[in-house]
Amino acid sequence: MIKKIIGKFFNYQTDPSFYDLDKISVEVSERDNIRSLHIGNDTIQSSMNLDDPISLQLNYTKVMALVLIFKANPEDVLFVGLGGASLQKFFYKYCEKTTFKTLEIHPHVIQVAKSFFHCPEDKRMEIINTDGVAYLNDHNESYDLIIS
């Protein structure tokens, strides 16, 4: 059921070629003290200010962070997708008692987020290399927030 709902909203791919991750490039660029992540093309997926890695650079991440207005102190947050870990870093800093789980399908994205984007690594931040939709379909877990 969840897979069908997410598929309707996010054009979830069921074609096997969607999972041929070796063909999807993961690249990092830098310009004017901003480091950016590109997945599969030159579109900026995530950006980080090298002088202030916690600050949110892209408008869509700023809008997504507004969820804290409605749920200021979540205990458990699930992120479906890691990218450059912009939201993970922001929530990690401002939600000090929260535990986080991130589902990321592309192993190179995880590696790049840790190596180039200061992705937090400790007991509060779990990153699982898996298909987020399949994970949600197969696990009956509850979270205060699910962010994708």
Question: Could you tell me what each predicted segment is?
Answer:
Residues 1-74, 93:
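Rossmann-like AdoMet
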Residues 19, 54-148:
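The AdoMet/dcAdoMet-binding core of the Class I SAM-like
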